[in-house]
């Protein structure tokens, strides 16, 4: 079976037992205050998305703000329909978000886009400007280089349709479970 970041993260989340989940990429470096800062916000919100400093492989700063580089919006409609604002390694969320997001729909573009939209449409999300990781980019990096999407306009539109469709299906599923 072909593996992808989405399938790998889905498998990991199925096994996650804690009340709080922090996503991480293997080559990013957490700052010492990441957990404490996110935990403070997770007392009021179900999902926290922090900013990051974008670095090269030697941790030299390339861009001081991931949010500015990617033009991150805090508006859930904008994030669902136009431009993704959710970067997995910058996310921490509660068990309820995890439980709602699983299992992942088969046609979602990427795990963090799905989790971020589930959190935004069903729970409370907080974007924080604190730069809590060094987001390392190098020649082997597959995702997020600030140079625009590698996908065609058609493919990006189909990703958005998939996210919106699956969020609507999830909302109907949850409402169906709570009305019976």
Which residues are covered by each model-predicted region?
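Short aromatic/hydrophobic "clamp" motif used to bind/position activated sugar donors
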Residues: 21
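Glycine-rich, basic loop-to-helix element that forms the pyrophosphate-binding segment
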Residues: 1-16
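Catalytic core of nucleotide-sugar-dependent glycosyltransferases
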Residues: 72-80, 135-139, 144-178
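The conserved acidic donor/metal-binding loop of glycosyltransferases
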Residues: 25-29, 51
